[in-house]
Amino acid sequence: MSPGVEALLEQARSGLQRLTPHETVAAVRGGALLIDTRTERHRREQGDLPGAIVIDRTVLEWRLDPASPWRIPEATGYDREIVVVCRHGYSSSLAAASLQTLGLRRATDMIGGVQGWISAGLPLSEHPADVRP
């Protein structure tokens, strides 16, 4: 019997060093990849994050695994810092835990998601999103 989604989320987060929106900005300045898994509709409603690479959740592991033939060029090694974001910071925790299971030990997510970013008063991008198929 499944322990439920809340237990799954708690387990996923227990292995993450989650970042605040301001810590995320600092991590990206230091070279971390900022990965946005939101849908096009949600990005249209909330706006895009500066410097984020948009990757659909259904192909996230394939695009970020350095050993995958379908990886993005920025997926340069298992030691690369990756910060995953979603709308509110729930599915991003599950995604980051999956990336850690894959061997990307520095994968994490941002507390509060894009809504947390907006609440923190951080700027949204003025440029089109960097969407990776």
Stretches found by the model and what they are:
Residues V85:
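Short, surface-exposed ligand- or partner-binding patches at beta-edge/loop junctions that are enriched
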